[in-house]
């Protein structure tokens, strides 16, 4: 530490802080672009499902894939691997997002978090009530949670199309609302769509959680080591009867939000490595250069919290890989056998479409208005009720999360396809109206700013 200048640590700490602050910008950028990829994947699925290759499309996702470990065989079809295994990675990233937001984001300050929490609750309750009211007599009420979800990638993608004239607070509230929506969706899946609970599986899951805590206590920093306890939790939840993909949420919520060490040690490592590289005799000494670079990588890893480091690494893979694959595997709805003359199918479609397209924005703006008028919270700076309505329309884009819930709610293929069609129609309407209303919102804001000048 003696040869470390007095202002070097603060300067590096400042750069680290700036990197942390830019994390949300990277998140929004990735989510916005991935919305386009998701749309293309869904369009491709619909095209295949309604073409001469429909049978090939269906048979492909039922192709068995398995592994042999001695006398132990593990085999499921591709559809299962996508929906139950790959989606665990999605929920892992979602769990990390929730963990970070609770620790240092918009959900860290309860007063600041009240508005998106209340808005999210309103945006879940009213769509569920609307769906329930349409399907109460038809006996298909178990699909009530389908229109309650929000697809964060699509919602932020539409917001990105509107450009930089949208207030930053609107981005933050939409992101916070979507994350709270994810929390509610996880709770709904765990408590309402988990059947035939087997307590023996809980023992396995708890053993996996205990192994995570043991690894953290020992100080294991490599994310690869946590695949084993994550797999144990996944298996335990499946045996229990809870959807195994929720293992990702558990693992994500357990990821540390603080660096494993204080900043002084890794910053010192970085400083020493820089000094080695600056020495003249290292310019041609590959061994010293390699040593210095290894030290820099170690210092960089230790300076970043595990939740930030792992989420940054996984997020692009989830956004551009896991979610488009999920969309391609599940958005393929055949219109050939779809019959709106069936009361059950028609009411499911109607409940989902109106729940997403009308229930979401109406629930969000009503709950927000009541919370503000009662004094429970207040609108953030630069935020208007027009902005809250825009958030409501964008939150009506359920797409991937709504499809995921519909697959848990409906086992009958005809009813499942009806729910999926409702999701696609409701999400599409919400996206179009959200984009159109967003353009009007920008023009009004521009006129208001000119008149104020």
From Swiss-Prot:
Keywords: Antiport, Cell inner membrane, Cell membrane, Ion transport, Membrane, Sodium, Sodium transport, Transmembrane, Transmembrane helix, Transport. GO terms for molecular function: sodium:proton antiporter activity. Its main location: membrane. It is a multi-pass membrane protein. The chain crosses the membrane at residues 27-47, 78-98, 114-134, 143-163, 172-192, 201-221, 222-242, 249-269, 316-336, 346-366, 385-405, 421-441. One of its GO terms (cellular component) is plasma membrane. GO terms for biological process: regulation of pH. It catalyses: Na(+)(in) + 2 H(+)(out) = Na(+)(out) + 2 H(+)(in). It is found in: Cell inner membrane. Na(+)/H(+) antiporter that extrudes sodium in exchange for external protons. Belongs to the NhaA Na(+)/H(+) (TC 2.A.33) antiporter family. This is Na(+)/H(+) antiporter NhaA. It comes from Bartonella henselae (strain ATCC 49882 / DSM 28221 / CCUG 30454 / Houston 1) (Rochalimaea henselae).
